[in-house]
Curated annotation (Swiss-Prot):
Regulates transcriptional attenuation of the pyrimidine nucleotide (pyr) operon in response to exogenous pyrimidines, probably by binding to specific sites on pyr mRNA. This probably disrupts an antiterminator hairpin in the RNA and favors formation of a downstream transcription terminator, leading to a reduced expression of downstream genes. It comes from the Bacteria. Disulfide bonds: none annotated. This is Pyrimidine operon regulatory protein. SUPFAM superfamilies: PRTase-like (SSF53271). GO terms for biological process: DNA-templated transcription termination. PANTHER family: BIFUNCTIONAL PROTEIN PYRR. A motif (PRPP-binding) lies at residues 93-105.
Length: 173
């Protein structure tokens, strides 16, 4: 299995900054926003977007962590580790994840969100969209579109979890 770095730390930081600017441009009422990171790396990505929003707009955007395992149709959950202490009813929720692939994680995340309240709308921000959707899911904010083969895997590394920032592609030999 060969691994190759396709995005370095600087390019990754720029992609996150671009996503943040797009969120600002497309949302007139930033005070209605709630960021919800999908565990695990989506949480770190959402925190970085939250920090950039604070730097750029001076707003402290509410933040939560969503565990999609209890809502998956293909995986068994040990326990729900969701941490969302915010009333999302009437809010503009931005779900944040590292990679969008089949759409199944996002479907599970939406199921989790509607159990918590009735947001005004739900948007999706992803660092990488690699294609191959199995469900009609589309990201509103995309850092990088990286078309892949089904025999390839995108690996997002984030310093908070992996010790460095990069995006790798792993190919089966």
């Amino acid at each position: 299995m060969a691994r190759k770095e396709i995005i370095d730390e600087i390019t990754m930081k720029r992609a996150i900054t671009r996503i943040t600017y797009e969120i600002i441009e497309r949302n007139k009422e930033l005070d209605k926003l709630v960021l919800i990171g999908i565990k695990t790396r989506g949480v770190y990505l959402a925190k970085r977007i939250q920090e950039r929003l604070q730097q750029l707009e001076g707003l402290e955007i509410p933040f939560g962590e969503l565990d999609t395992r209890p809502f998956r149709d293909d995986k068994q959950a040990q326990e729900d580790t969701t941490e969302i202490d915010i009333d999302i009813t009437g809010k503009d929720v931005i779900l944040v994840d590292d990679v969008l692939y089949t759409g199944r994680t996002i479907r599970a995340a939406i199921d989790g969100i509607v159990k918590l309240g009735r947001p005004a709308r739900v948007q999706l921000a992803v660092l990488v969209d690699r294609g191959h959707r199995e469900l009609p899911i589309r990201a509103d904010y995309v850092g990088k579109n990286i078309p892949t083969g089904r025999d390839e895997e995108i690996i997002v590394q984030m310093s908070e979890h992996d010790g460095n920032d990069s995006i790798l592609i792993k190919r089966e030999d």
